[in-house]
């Protein structure tokens, strides 16, 4: 069984996750969905072309993009209540102590126990989810009425 100590975040993963915070939520869900699809080993020849959100949005037909966005949203929705509670708690205690990549990696480690394998040890997926939580903000995460992801 893997623990959060086994998770490694490459500099590229953290840089890209930090950039995602400035994107719209659908763009982040698109990237998350493509990573989830990779982990599920979905056989899709267009997946090899999904290099970045910009490439996806501008060069692939919408019917090739929407399934990945939907997959990202559905994945996050499954875990939203636990993520919201953990994110609220962790950001309340640590949000002012960290910034940028340190904030992303700290929150990613804090939420890793909420997911089954392989997602609980996949740094890129955890960093993307941490970016979504950071972008949503502490007000959204700590709102008891926020039943669905942004």
Locate the predicted segments by residue.
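Membrane-inserting effector segments that mediate pore formation, membrane fusion
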Residues: 87-144
């Amino acid at each position: 069984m893997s623990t959060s100590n086994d998770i490694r975040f490459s500099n590229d993963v953290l840089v890209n996750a930090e950039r995602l915070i400035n994107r719209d939520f659908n763009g982040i869900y698109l990237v998350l969905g493509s990573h989830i699809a990779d982990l599920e080993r979905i056989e899709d020849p267009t997946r090899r072309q999904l290099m970045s959100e910009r490439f996806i949005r501008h060069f692939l037909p919408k019917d090739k993009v929407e399934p990945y966005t939907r997959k990202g949203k559905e994945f996050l929705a499954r875990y939203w209540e636990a993520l919201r509670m953990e994110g609220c708690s962790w950001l309340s205690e640590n949000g002012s102590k960290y910034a940028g990549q340190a904030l992303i990696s700290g929150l990613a480690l804090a939420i890793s126990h909420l997911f089954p394998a392989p997602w609980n040890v996949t740094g890129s997926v955890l960093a993307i989810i941490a970016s979504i939580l950071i972008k949503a903000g502490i007000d959204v995460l700590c709102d008891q009425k926020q039943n669905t992801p942004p």
